[in-house]
């Protein structure tokens, strides 16, 4: 019996990204003198694929949720919204990275091609409805980033960070795959919808292999998210990688990892909510505690922001573990806004790193207000937002998660989260103090950057303020996704 051909239209944007990645790779080989062409081709690709994704979802004849490739790929509101934010995040990451990479002679074509391929893994992961596509998307996301971390071949720390990232990433993938194999063995299916039905129909005491599989899946996901106690790679990789790569891996992949949690736990195993709820509580508390307390003692701003990301992913998990639509939407809002804030923070680190100078220490930001008041103001907005100061978006995101916790009577966890947030505010305010109340060392060069970079960092900083004052549209979007 001949098999029915899959409908390729829902996956056309992903195919377009793959095609353009190959075109840009060839362009980089044959047009070596005009080294900016790969950059502009990449940015045009991101604009076109965002428009194509929105057009296919909005104006095609599909229902609100459509499956293709034998139920392995799904196009729904959740996937479309997250894809658009991934495209936006990568677009800004490439703007910030261009001058930094050119100054350090980091291979530009390879950087953009690997970035696009990693982004292809992210969007494939977001649209996964099968354990096979979840794993393939995750590996396509991860493998290019291992190479990107080690791209700065003249820097030993970069190569070392790439090796660490690869080895620990391989362990995480192995754990995740082992967990998936147990789930497949217990349910006889790779389809997440079918797995959910099989898990609901099976009394847990008759099939303990499901719980073992769940433990390995949660551990693998925690590794990929960089949450405690599986966080050991995060500070070393963030510090050792070129700042342009740190910027990339600290933003869009977090959105894709959030989507992986939703697909695996919410779509695939809702009947095991009690079990994964308890695991996520432990992971979230450890992440908030270790992340915030370890960040306090850091003098390297990239390590500080790395520990900060561990804490923020802990806050995001608080929304997921609520097990309610409101909690999932709050976690989605938190992930998107954290990605925006992280873009701005690492964007400033990249912007300050000029002429072979690496702005990696907190003291390198000393006197920034006297050197460039506008950039200091943008950095202050971003840092205060990360700290959760009203009326910035970081405050709104934290309030959303706390509200979701209180609604499910987890008041003790909400109080704990507030206490950790107070601890976390210290290390952000310390950077602001250095920028505004300490004088700049005389040897520091003037801050010069392109108009494109200034516009990007200004939009980034003002977006943090604007969404904080008018969060309703993004909250509505997050609720619509569920």
Swiss-Prot record:
GO terms for cellular component: plasma membrane. Keywords: Cell inner membrane, Cell membrane, Membrane, NAD, Quinone, Translocase, Transmembrane, Transmembrane helix, Transport, Ubiquinone. It is found in: Cell inner membrane. Its EC number is 7.1.1.-. The keyword Transferase does not apply. GO terms for molecular function: NADH dehydrogenase (ubiquinone) activity; NADH:ubiquinone reductase (non-electrogenic) activity; quinone binding. GO terms for biological process: ATP synthesis coupled electron transport. It comes from the Bacteria. It catalyses: a quinone + NADH + 5 H(+)(in) = a quinol + NAD(+) + 4 H(+)(out). InterPro entries: NADH-Q_OxRdtase_suN/2, ND/Mrp_TM. It is an enzyme of class 7 (translocase). HAMAP family: NDH1_NuoN_1 (MF_00445). NDH-1 is composed of 14 different subunits. Subunits NuoA, H, J, K, L, M, N constitute the membrane sector of the complex. Belongs to the complex I subunit 2 family. This is NADH-quinone oxidoreductase subunit N. It comes from Coxiella burnetii (strain RSA 493 / Nine Mile phase I).
């Amino acid at each position: 019996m001949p098999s029915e051909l899959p409908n390729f239209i829902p996956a056309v944007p992903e195919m377009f990204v793959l095609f353009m990645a190959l075109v840009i790779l060839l362009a980089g080989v044959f047009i070596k003198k005009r080294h900016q062409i790969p950059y502009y081709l990449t940015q045009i690709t991101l604009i076109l694929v965002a428009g194509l994704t929105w057009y296919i979802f909005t104006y095609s004849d599909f229902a609100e949720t459509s499956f293709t490739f034998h139920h392995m790929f799904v196009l729904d509101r959740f996937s479309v919204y997250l894809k658009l934010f991934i495209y936006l995040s990568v677009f800004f990451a490439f703007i910030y990275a261009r001058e930094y990479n050119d100054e350090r002679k980091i291979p530009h074509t390879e950087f953009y091609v690997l970035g696009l391929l990693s982004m292809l893994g992210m969007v494939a992961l977001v649209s996964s409805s099968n354990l096979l596509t979840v794993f393939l998307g995750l590996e396509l996301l991860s493998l290019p980033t291992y190479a990107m971390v080690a791209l700065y071949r003249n820097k030993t720390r970069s190569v070392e960070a790439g090796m660490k990232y690869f080895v620990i990433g391989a362990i995480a993938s192995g754990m995740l795959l082992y967990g998936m194999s147990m789930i497949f063995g217990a349910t006889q299916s790779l389809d997440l919808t079918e797995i959910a039905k099989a898990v609901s129909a099976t009394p847990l005491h008759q099939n303990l292999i499901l719980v073992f599989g769940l433990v390995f899946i949660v551990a693998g996901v925690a590794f990929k998210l960089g949450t405690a106690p599986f966080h050991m790679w995060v500070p070393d990789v963030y510090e050792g990688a070129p700042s342009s790569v740190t910027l990339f891996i600290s933003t869009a992949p977090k959105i894709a990892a959030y989507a992986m949690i939703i697909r695996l736990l919410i779509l695939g195993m809702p009947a095991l909510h009690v079990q994964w709820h308890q695991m996520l509580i432990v992971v979230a508390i450890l992440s908030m505690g270790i992340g915030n307390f370890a960040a306090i003692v850091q003098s390297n701003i990239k390590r500080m922001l790395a520990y900060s990301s561990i804490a923020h992913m802990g806050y995001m998990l608080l929304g997921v573990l609520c097990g309610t639509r409101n909690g999932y939407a709050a976690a989605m809002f938190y992930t998107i806004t954290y990605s925006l804030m992280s873009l701005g923070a690492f964007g400033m680190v990249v912007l300050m790193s000029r002429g072979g100078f690496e702005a990696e220490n907190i003291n390198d930001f000393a006197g920034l207000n006297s050197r460039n008041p506008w950039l200091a103001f943008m950095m202050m907005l971003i840092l205060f937002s990360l700290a959760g100061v009203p009326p910035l978006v970081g405050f709104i995101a934290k309030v959303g998660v706390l509200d979701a916790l209180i609604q499910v009577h987890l008041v003790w966890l909400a109080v704990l989260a507030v206490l950790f947030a107070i601890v976390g505010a210290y290390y952000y305010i310390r950077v602001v103090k250095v920028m505004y109340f300490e004088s700049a060392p005389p040897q520091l060069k003037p801050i010069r950057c392109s108009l494109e970079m200034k516009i990007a960092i200004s939009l980034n900083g003002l977006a943090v303020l604007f969404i904080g004052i008018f969060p309703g549209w993004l909250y509505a979007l997050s609720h619509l996704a569920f």
